């Protein structure tokens, strides 16, 4: 048999056989296949896929008319409203990069982001206009003579106080719908010439003190949009409830993915258990994503706000802080099917999933919940995932006990951090993306996070997983939410300090008795050195996606001062 020459690999790319990957094509296809199907619902507003496509083309055209295109960044400060959904397509259709800004950030942080990203335009929901206005004033003061005011567009919403919109318009901002009128609904948008072109910029300002700009590509967004939908088993025509903020990792890529599957997007400005249950009943919601704290809110909803049993199976994807098995069990008991995922802003959101195995079906529910609480295996678009010894970069044994760092590589990894070569060098060391999360690898190959490297508590030379302590505390009947951090300890160096939010029905008149009861509970369920030496009650500081801000709690624990010598 003759050998095939190199010419088998020398066939060139051309316009007929190669197109840069971009999720923008999903919208064009949805408008063609299901032009009259409802694409987006927000209050009384209903759009079809054809209308959404035309609106996005208008939006892109209007941006180009203001000389905003390739190389530009457009910041959007808004909750889950149609304009934010449209921006995910329209801004890159114009050739620009979309930067979805966390609405819970303060003005000084937003000023930093707008300056760091050189935002050419700022779109802001009317409710947050004063926040954007203050941020722009700070940016102008800091930039001085170099300041160039960005194009300012205000997004009106009938559910908000009309006075805030009136004020914004008086300052010279353009109303969003008026802005669209200046564009062409038949705008001939062009896909990127290179799929490595940037599509999105996000900032990792969640649980750390210093934000870093995460740059994502059209290629990565395309692959992760499909990968996220495939691993979750989303079917064509799914009805998706936006409980997860779209500004968090581009809504875990479901902003683009829902167009690929021609589904329906239900927008929620504010997330409450009542709102979630009502949407399930009213719209027939089939899927939603949420941080564990939202799941906790759902399972602890008052009976008058809940709908039990559910009218149909509802699929839920959760990520963020690892959910306690008790919460997963409670969600399952109420009729929700929870898929547990894990990821970071640097990996387009979730990039691993605890893929369900048929053999788990016959296990007791609590055992199922424990297995499902693991972070699992890689997404289809993530080619490399491992847990390694950071000193040697060798994989840890799959024994379920040896901890190492989670590392990743593949199409699900960001292009890099904007204007931060040092961070890029550190994050991409040895050809892997370093997550900073500590995990074990089980015999079945599934990984399970034990802690963030900075969240490990070192007490008397022994490592304590704050996550393990938290999971036990969630079993206490009075605990609604909990976060455990290190507190200085005169004898042990550090000891666990538990910050606890109590359930609404708990008598809070005697916190000392409650604290003693919680500590006693822990002593019966964990090694003595794991037991929290101090318990603090009150609401926990969180990001917009419900992640508990441990850096704030660590600072608070430090301010409390060192614990005096104890025998525990």
Swiss-Prot record:
| Entry EC no(s) | 6.2.1.1, 6.2.1.-, 6.2.1.17
Record-listed ATP binding positions: 204-212, 340-345, 437, 449-452, 547
Which key words are in the record? ATP-binding, Cytoplasm, Ligase, Nucleotide-binding
Q: Which CDD domains match?
A: ttLC_FACS_AEE21_like (cd12118)
Naturally occurring in which organism (per UniProt): Humulus lupulus (European hop)
A GO CC annotation given for this chain: cytosol
Enzyme class, UniProt record, top EC level: ligase
Protein name, please?
Acetate--CoA ligase CCL3
Gene field:
CCL3
* Domain comment in the entry: Both substrate-binding domains (SBD1 and SBD2) are involved in the substrate recognition, and are sufficient to confer the substrate specificity.
Task: Describe its function.
Answer: Involved in the biosynthesis of prenylated phenolics natural products which contribute to the bitter taste of beer and display broad biological activities. Catalyzes the ligation of CoA on propanoate to produce propanoyl-CoA. Can also use 2-methylpropanoate (isobutyric acid), acetate, butanoate, isovalerate, pentanoate, hexanoate, 2-methylbutanoate, 2-methylpentanoate, 3-methylpentanoate and 4-methylpentanoate as substrates with a lower efficiency.
Q: Where in the cell is it found?
A: Cytoplasm, Cytosol
**Location of the region described as SBD1 in the Swiss-Prot/TrEMBL record:** 272-340
Task: Report which superkingdom the organism of origin falls in.
Answer: Eukaryota
- Keyword Ligase (UniProt): yes
The UniProt record lists the keyword Manganese: no
**Gene Ontology molecular functions:** 2-methylbutanoate-CoA ligase activity; acetate-CoA ligase activity; ATP binding; CoA-ligase activity; medium-chain fatty acid-CoA ligase activity; propionate-CoA ligase activity
What InterPro entries is this protein classified in?
AMP-bd_C, AMP-bd_C_sf, AMP-dep_synth/lig_dom, ANL_N_sf
Q: Which catalysed reactions does the entry list for this protein?
A: acetate + ATP + CoA = acetyl-CoA + AMP + diphosphate; propanoate + ATP + CoA = propanoyl-CoA + AMP + diphosphate; butanoate + ATP + CoA = butanoyl-CoA + AMP + diphosphate; 3-methylbutanoate + ATP + CoA = 3-methylbutanoyl-CoA + AMP + diphosphate
Please list where the region (SBD2) is annotated.
341-417
**Pathway info:** Secondary metabolite biosynthesis
Q: In which tissues is it expressed?
A: Mostly expressed in glandular trichomes (lupulin glands) after flowering and in old leaves, and, to a lower extent, in stems, young leaves, cones and flowers.
Offer one Pfam family short name for this entry.
AMP-binding_C
Give the similarity note.
Answer: Belongs to the ATP-dependent AMP-binding enzyme family.
